Amino acid sequence: MNKIYNEFINYSKNNFKRNLSWLDRDVDSPTHGSFDRNYWHYKITDFNSDILQQGIYTLIALYKENIPNSYNKLKLKKLILSVTKYTIKSYQKNSSFNEYYPNEDGYPPLAFISNVLGDTFIEFPEFLELKNIKKTYKEINLYLSKLTEFNASNQYAVGIAGLYKFLKFFPELKNNVNINFHLNNILKLQDNEEGWFNEYDGFDLGYLSVTLEALSDIYEISENHKIINSINGIIF
């Protein structure tokens, strides 16, 4: 294993429990599955910041043993399902997701949640067959497909990655999602000479790393040569 990967494993082993402390694991709690401790525990806010549901990635990494651990896999899977159900329920409540304030209906939480749900269902496709999950997952992505985001490329790229993952399960909805329209849009946001993507009229290395990861996910699914050319523009 290379040095960077070893450092990542080290960091993960030392910090994943801190991340899990944000999760409401009480099966009798009405907020069971929420990753927003400020909401369900401290009561600092009166709504769930849905974008924090991405904490599910830690659970999935533990389940797949990408982070070494000795946890019971069945218990981990139940926790992953609880987060998935709570995320779906959060959308059902308002037909949107919130991040910073109630009724925000923000693009970032919608995009990132679409993406994380796609990754979750790729690992656990059986979750899609549970009551209301498939229906709501479709609603989330059909709504997302109607939106664009030209000021923050990282958000748009993640949203498009979420749509590509959605189409793995529902290829018959490709025309409804208009995926090529979104793909062409995101590629136009890249600087042709230097390879960076627009973030509020400029360059941002941190956001660019998010865009790079999203484009890599898109390429893995689509194998579109335009994407690999774009990725090469970022790296080289």
Question: For each predicted feature, which ranges?
Answer:
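Low-complexity, Ser/Thr/Pro/Gly-enriched N-terminal "stalk/linker" regions
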Residues: 1-51, 74-86
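Aromatic-lined, polymer-binding surfaces characteristic
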Residues: 45-69, 73-222, 227-228
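Active-site/pore-lining binding-face segments in mid-to-C-terminal subdomains
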Residues: 37, 41, 223-236
